[in-house]
Structure formats: C-alpha cells, structure tokens
Design a protein with these regions (language model features):
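Active-site-adjacent "subsite" loops/lids of carbohydrate-active enzymes
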Residues: 1-38
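Stable alpha-helical elements in mature extracytoplasmic
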Residues: 14-18, 48, 52, 136-139
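Loop/turn elements at helix/coil->beta-strand transitions in domains of secreted/extracellular proteins
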Residues: 25-30, 60-65, 204
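Active-site-adjacent beta->alpha loops and helix N-cap segments on the catalytic face
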Residues: 38-52
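Glycan-recognition surfaces
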Residues: 47, 57-153
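Aromatic- and carboxylate-lined catalytic core of secreted/periplasmic carbohydrate-active enzymes
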Residues: 114, 118-189, 269-273
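Carbohydrate-binding surface patches
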Residues: 141-144, 149-151, 187-229, 259, ...
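Extracytoplasmic
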Residues: 229-235, 246, 250-410
C-alpha cells in the first residue's frame, strides 16, 4: 500500500475513472489537484488538463464542472476547460494565510465572470480566526465571487461564526447573477478599496469593500467619482445589516481597525463614466502565476503608479498584449487618451481601439530617472463598450501604469 497515493490518480486511466464518477455515480463536479503531475511526472499543465476535459466530454458529460488546482493562477487557457481554478497555496485558519490569498486575487478580476471564477480555497470560518478577521475572510470571498465551500466542523462551530456563514446579504453578493469579481480602485497607505457592479451592468448599484489588512488603524477617503457614483448616494453595511447615513459632499470617510473590512451595497442617483483605467484591470492573455518563465508578463508593484501597480513585460510578440474590454462611453465621440508609463530606452508601444488601425507610439521618453512619464493621443470611442489594446508585436513594450480619458468638447 502506497501511503502517498502514487499511481492512484487520474493519470493513465482517465476514461475508466470518468466513467465511474460521472456515468455510474452521477457526480457533476470534480476538483483536480496537480499532485505528482508536476513534481514526479513533469507534465505540462494545459496539455494535461485538456486531456482530462476531453475524456470527460467524450463520455457525453460536458455538463461536468472542473476545478483546476495548480496552487497558482494557471493561465487564461483554464477558462476553456474549467469553471474555476485555485489561485494560491492551500488556506490555513490563520490571518496571514487569509491575507496572502486576498493579495493573490486582488488583480485577477479580468479573468472572472460569465460563469468562471478565481477560487480562493475553502472557508476557514469557525476555526480560530478573530471575529473581525472572519468578516474579512467571508466578506472578501463573497465580493470577489470565490466559490464558497465550508471547511469547518458544523457540529462545533461557534454561534457567531455560524451567523456569519448564514449572512443572506453577503451570500446574495457572492451569488449575484452578474458573477463579477471586485477590482481595486484605490490603494492608499495600507488600505484597499474594491468595487464591482451588481444586479445590472452599468447600473446605479455597486458593491464596495474598504479593506484594511494592516496591523494598525487605517483611514479611508473615497471620492464617489472613483466608484463611478454621482449625486446622492445611499449605502448599506452588508455585514451588520445596517443602512448608513446618506453620503454627502461626494466623499466617503471612514477609519477601520486592523484586520477588518467594510462591505457596502451602494446606490446612487446617477452612474458616471470612468476617467481612469488602471493597467492592473487589464486582461493579459499570456499571463500566468506559475513562475516557470522569466520575463513573462506580470502585474507588479510600483509605488509611483496611480494605483500602486503596473503591468510589466508587455510585447515582444503580437499576442502578448494588455486589453481593457469594457471602456465605456455614454455617447461616444472624440477623446484625449493620456497613457502613463515607465520610461525605458528602446521601447515602443502600439495602441489599438476596437480592433481598428494600430497607433504606433515611438516618440516616448527614455529618461529612466523619471519614474512615470505620459503621452496623450486622440482616440475615437463608440457609444457603449470599447476595447482598447496595448502592446508591441516586434519589441518589448513599455511598462504601463494606467490611462485616462477626457472627452473633447464639441
């Protein structure tokens, strides 16, 4: 008997196991860890999971949902094979583990949605975290649309923890039909502000999280315009089930204690157009977090960046680009687009709007003593959602901080 289970996995008998699990036993979900495939067999992830998906589909079981567990974001290919994928090492019932997993998922919102999710691992509610840490754990899993699997003994769970797990407003947030993952719109000091649409895309209702992962009190000053909310704004605390006073003056001010979160449902009189699009919101088709390839495209910290992050190692080939898929304009028209980038010699940048002719930017700053430089170009946006792509098909592109949009007066 092999205590490590070597030889007992799917490898080599996919059809046999799939027949048993899905045809005979009738299961419709399977979580597939990569145990042994990388360490002992040195298999390639995309190829291996594709073989398993094909074996299941060949049985007429295309309805079966797969969860890929490679303990890191595996790559954009996962979306074609699975409904969800793990993005981190296994969770532990410790604050450091919860914080680490949230950190891993802060900039992966572009890969969630339309029935596909970044899996932050099972819930450790009721296993020793402090009450405010449990609120962070459950609240952030909900607003980031992670699958929710209870990981504690329900016969011994504390009453306060059980009450949190049964919070209908947080569960509704997680199960919102749009299925979107909240993204970071502000990172100042140690605090993060995340937001996402709920109920209706481009509607007046949004979910917002003020998240303090630090060990000290954190002050938040959140302008409503960065949340794209205009006019009078109502807010409801989804953890405490309390309506808050109407937000006046266009700014939400709060202080949060260490290891805490405020999860809000916010409703405004009108929805505003975004004027800033961060690089860390972009979809990167060549991105993965496996760490196998040096100089591969990545979201990277940069203190001087508007949101504290940049995208590095763009370009070098046509398919290695950054893409913002929902750049919204109410009426369409002419805009000035200002791109903030990190100067570097011998770099170019191609910009493409709605798959039309590329704009080649080669008159760019190479002064590496500048932390951030910018260039402004005219662009035409159609009414509704627009797709903006940046990269370079023939050389490395510049690292991107963000771009801003300003409508040209007619």
């Amino acid at each position: 008997k092999d205590m490590n289970g070597i030889g007992s996995g799917l490898y080599g008998h996919e059809f046999q196991d799939a027949t048993l699990y899905f045809k005979e036993w009738g299961f419709d979900f399977i979580k597939i860890d990569y145990c042994g495939a990388g360490q002992e067999l040195n298999l390639e992830e995309e190829k291996r999971y594709t073989e398993i998906r094909q074996a299941i589909d060949n049985l007429g079981c295309g309805h079966v949902s797969i969860n890929i567990c490679r303990w890191a974001f595996p790559g954009t290919w996962a979306r074609n094979l699975a409904r969800s994928w793990r993005i981190s090492a296994d969770i532990r019932p410790e604050w450091g583990s919860v914080k680490y997993i949230i950190d891993k998922n802060l900039y992966l919102s572009a890969y969630a949605g339309e029935g596909h999710y970044n899996d932050m691992d099972m819930l450790e509610i009721g296993r020793g975290l402090k009450p405010e840490e449990e609120e962070v754990h459950f609240g952030m899993w909900c607003i980031m649309s992670s699958p929710l699997l209870i990981g504690c003994d329900l016969t011994t769970i504390p009453e306060t923890s059980l009450k949190l797990l049964k919070n209908k407003e947080l569960i509704a947030l997680n199960q919102d039909p749009l299925g979107l993952q909240a993204y970071v719109v502000q990172h100042e000091n140690e605090g993060y502000v995340l937001v996402k649409d709920i109920e209706r895309k481009r509607g007046n209702v949004r979910a917002v999280a003020l998240y303090n992962p630090s060990d000290t009190i954190c002050s938040f000053t959140v302008p409503m315009n960065i949340l794209e909310l205009g006019g009078k704004v109502k807010a409801r605390d989804l953890v405490k089930h309390q309506d808050l006073p109407e937000i006046k003056g266009g700014v939400l001010n709060r202080e949060l204690p260490p290891h805490s979160v405020l999860i809000l449902r916010m409703e405004s009189e009108k929805r505003l157009e975004a004027t800033v699009y961060e690089a860390e919101w972009a979809y990167l088709p060549c991105f993965n977090d496996l760490g196998k390839t040096p100089k591969s495209i990545v979201y990277a910290p940069l203190h001087e960046a508007s949101g504290g992050m940049k995208v590095s190692y763009l370009g070098g080939r046509k398919e290695n680009f950054a893409e913002w898929k929902e750049v919204y304009s109410e009426q369409g028209g002419e805009y000035e687009m200002t791109i903030r980038y990190v100067p570097k010699a011998d770099r170019k940048l191609e910009v493409c709007v709605n798959n039309e002719k590329r704009i080649l930017l080669d008159s760019l700053s190479a002064d590496e003593t500048q932390k951030i430089a910018s260039i402004t170009v005219p662009v035409h946006l159609k009414a509704g959602n627009n797709k903006i792509r940046m990269g370079s098909s023939f050389c490395w592109a510049l690292d991107i901080d963000c771009f801003t949009l300003k409508k040209v007066s007619e």
